[in-house]
């Protein structure tokens, strides 16, 4: 269990009489001691909502997902551990709310934890709750603001003697607590599934190992046929702070991994071979897009529409014509009738609001951005709907690739 010392928030409340002095040195910080007491907790997604106190019944986000990352290139976190992604309150049918309370959107998570006497928690998060871009604080802020604010039992009114940002501490503390009980790396290793540059595994092998440890199936996510994420699903009897987490079946979207040939890439770099029969071939970039053409989207094993002039993914109608202009020998820029194109705020967009064009390249015939040929979206467009394309995976569930169809 993580150890803590009283922070300024606790000391201030003790001195002003809001907390007894004896309580500020209480070593057990696994859950808030002044959160709402629930006499007869009901299990979320099993009991029907009929007006229960949502301080004791997680609603509407009653399906809790503890999500973990395996980032191998670039390597993120310890070589023998997965890292934390977040704790997400899904609806029982797989949908979800996001950014539920603008008044509780914080940008100082580290300071909040330290001021609450949880420097121990911050230290652990700095090792195991990692952002692949290197900005851990930004990831923590994103997870709280997008997901934490949507957990009903973390509302400030659910505390008998609330101190500022107490619910933020509870969110990160509970996420770490659940993560520590789900050692994905060790669970897979116990089943003979270990990172390797040569071995591959089946989806059934991976699912069997993780489901046995979790006591319920899990959601397994891949990127370019390689293990990338695991989602553990729970329902909760009572509040997030003090309730019982019960393993549950996955909701909503299932795995995107192939049935066989799944790679589990080591985080540490491959050691060079001392002897080789033939020299290795360097990776080369493809011929840059040029002239005028369409940006064709492929996803889920087939062609799925194209990109229209403002940079959105569209499945119906006419594809936009883009101009590819040479930037260097290996790179080029893109422009539509609306204007130049770039990733702004991680989202692909074209228009007069874009101030500087992005440089792209080609790998294996696919559009490449910063070395990646896989892009992401929240959903595949249908009918007249359009979808935003993102450069990083984050929590975007659809993988896609973009190719060029030259127009003459």
UniProtKB/Swiss-Prot annotation:
GO terms for cellular component: extracellular region; vacuolar lumen. PANTHER family: RIBONUCLEASE T2. Belongs to the RNase T2 family. It comes from Aspergillus fumigatus (strain ATCC MYA-4609 / CBS 101355 / FGSC A1100 / Af293) (Neosartorya fumigata). Rnase which modulates cell survival under stress conditions. Released from the vacuole to the cytoplasm during stress to promote tRNA and rRNA cleavage and to activate separately a downstream pathway that promotes cell death. Involved in cell size, vacuolar morphology and growth at high temperatures and high salt concentration. It catalyses: a ribonucleotidyl-ribonucleotide-RNA + H2O = a 3'-end 3'-phospho-ribonucleotide-RNA + a 5'-end dephospho-ribonucleoside-RNA + H(+). It comes from the Eukaryota. Gene3D superfamilies: Ribonuclease T2-like. This is Ribonuclease T2-like. Residues 275-288 have a biased composition (Low complexity).
